[in-house]
């Protein structure tokens, strides 16, 4: 193990996104919260319908149907069926990948326009 200490990564929450809209765009706090909530509700609803969601410069969310398959109980070795299910996948855009690859300085919010 190295002696380099890395900062604990932060988690950006919906409440913090609303606060950022309040600070940067000038919306009141209620409007900012409503916009963030509506944004994520629309994404959730589209995915629930089986639609894809494409956010230019960010990435694509898609729903995939996974077929049933045999699995194995790791304790007993017994074969058990794993049911079919739907999963959400995310593929980052090239733009997002290139920003994430260079974590030394946060991106300038003005350059995202």
From Swiss-Prot:
Molecular function terms from GO: DNA binding; structural constituent of chromatin
Annotated protein name in UniProt: Integration host factor subunit alpha
Gene Ontology CC annotations of this record: cytosol
Function of the molecule: This protein is one of the two subunits of integration host factor, a specific DNA-binding protein that functions in genetic recombination as well as in transcriptional and translational control.
SMART domains named among the record's database cross-references: BHL
Region (Disordered): 59-80
Any Gene Ontology biological process: regulation of translation
Lineage, broadest ranks: Bacteria, Pseudomonadati, Pseudomonadota, Betaproteobacteria, Burkholderiales
Any one Pfam family match given in the protein's UniProt record, by short name: Bac_DNA_binding
Family statement drawn from the similarity comment of this UniProt entry: Belongs to the bacterial histone-like protein family.
Key words of the record: DNA recombination, DNA-binding, Transcription, Transcription regulation, Translation regulation
InterPro entries (UniProt xref): Hist_DNA-bd, Histone-like_DNA-bd_CS, IHF-like_DNA-bd_dom_sf, IHF_alpha
Organism: Bordetella parapertussis (strain 12822 / ATCC BAA-587 / NCTC 13253)
